[in-house]
Amino acid sequence: MKPATVKISSVALKHNIQIIKQKAPHSKIIAVVKANAYGHGVEFVSSTLENLVDGFGVARLAEALSVRSNGVTKPILLLEGFFSPKDLPILSVNNIQTVVHNQDQLDAIKRANLENPIKVWLKIDTGMHRLGVSLEEVDYYYNELMNCPNVDEVGFVSHFSRADETDSDYTNIQLNRFLDATKNKKGNRTIAASGGILFWEDSHLEYIRPGIIMYGVSPINIPSSEYGLIPVMTLTSSLIAVRDHKKGEPVGYGGIWVSERDTKIGVVAIGYGDGYPRNVPAGTPIYINGRRVPIVGRVSMDMVTVDLGPDCKDKVGDEAVLWGKELPIEEVAEITGLLSYELMTKLTPRVLTEYVD
């Protein structure tokens, strides 16, 4: 019997990369492994994929150094850019590339005393309005970076705000702005993340940046299997009790659920202390012994309760799947009103991790 455990499949991870390559056969891949590889384990994911991708994308310098210290030699890109001028010498000696999106960063690079020049990606705001230089500033920043001795190479990066809305023309508007801004300029380009890879073929360009689809999860509320993807993460726990329960009796804090029949209640060893969302409504499914059973009562810190039915054969120690291939995380996300991204990255350190082939 095991407590809450995530099982991470290297086979599924490699399979998903092959699907991504089929979607964008002419693009190089920057695999996004920020936030501990979306909760999958950055060391495991980066080492598994090093020979299958062309580089890695992270949000923070500490994440980049974690990947590098794991023996990975491929380029690493800071997707938010560096936070302090003191970071630049570290980037220089560790083959870490950086986004530049403001004047302070440009000034810091020009002033820095670096052992090796660094590769820079100029972030262009094409409509996300979060990070990036304006379209009118692109020529200025590009020329300044190209003439800076501390810069080895300049690329271009932007980000779609509505790539998961396949009926919106805003993605095409952003793409055309990006293409116009980088026209006749030397440098690789990347604008497509997961949504762009799946739904906007013209956006693939020289590099793509797969994130959530790499982990076998759809960026929209359609099961990833529709795109040939396989979930890399399966969240499981165990039944720690199977109890007879009388009709009319409540279950859990507040007694908000009352059984309408004699039944058997199962107790699963997982709760919001493990990162399972407290706000899941009654009826949210858990997969046990080949069938879905509904959560009843409130999720507590360490346990959830399920209605196993009066004729169940389940026993203590049986595995319960909270999400995975048998129960898509996209479905759990839709029920809870959360994003799949949130569910995966909110799991707490006490959840055990098993890496499987």
From Swiss-Prot:
- Reactions it catalyzes: L-alanine = D-alanine
- Annotated catalytic residues: K34 (proton acceptor), Y253 (proton acceptor)
Q: Which SUPFAM superfamilies is this protein grouped with?
A: Alanine racemase C-terminal domain-like, PLP-binding barrel
> N6-(pyridoxal phosphate)lysine occurs at which residues?
K34
Coiled coil where? none
**Ligand binding (substrate):** R130, M301
One BP annotation, GO: D-alanine biosynthetic process
Q: In which pathway does it act?
A: Amino-acid biosynthesis; D-alanine biosynthesis; D-alanine from L-alanine: step 1/1
Q: Name one GO cellular component term.
A: cytosol
Record GO terms (molecular function): alanine racemase activity; pyridoxal phosphate binding
Q: Which cofactor does it need?
A: pyridoxal 5'-phosphate
Task: Identify the CDD domains for this entry.
Answer: PLPDE_III_AR_proteobact
In short, the EC number is: 5.1.1.1
Provide the alphabetized UniProt keywords.
Answer: Isomerase, Pyridoxal phosphate
Which Pfam families did the record assign?
Answer: Ala_racemase_C (PF00842), Ala_racemase_N (PF01168)
Q: Which PANTHER family match?
A: ALANINE RACEMASE, ALANINE RACEMASE, BIOSYNTHETIC
Q: Which family does it belong to?
A: Belongs to the alanine racemase family.
Q: What does this protein do?
A: Catalyzes the interconversion of L-alanine and D-alanine. May also act on other amino acids.
User: NCBIfam families in the record, alphabetically?
Assistant: alr (TIGR00492)
Know the name of this protein? Alanine racemase
Task: Please tell me the species this chain comes from.
Answer: Mannheimia succiniciproducens (strain KCTC 0769BP / MBEL55E)
